[in-house]
Amino acid sequence: MSSKRYTLAQWLEHAEAGFSQQTQWRVPGVHDQSPRLEAQWLLAAALEKNIAWLMTWPERELTAAQLQRAEAWLARRLCGEPLALLRGEHEFWSLPLSVTADTLVPRADSERLVEVALERMAQMNLSAPAILDLGTGSGAIAL
């Protein structure tokens, strides 16, 4: 590990450059992926903060431990590992779900599927329908 020191703003620029040069981190079929936003999400997650906090304190210097974690996560993310797996958690319909390499990470289109199902059930006046969620991954849809 180098003894390089970074402020939050400097590390975000460093990570953004990495994301701009690599393509493995991109999700196929999703066209609005921003290297800057990806860097912000990654650093916020690594520091267990939110993006607003990063923007409020751009001059704050990363500690050695924070830098080590951020760099390790950046290397894994650049190789295509989803941020949710780095964090061990993914939010689905405002529910924080634990995820591992053994589970499928719920996607935005899965949330849309739930929305459509709820709309259809309302149209059909189904107040307590029987629904089977079998073999769909993390079980997020059933929740």
Describe the function of each predicted region.
Residues R112-L143:
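Conserved SAM/SAH cofactor-binding pocket of Class I
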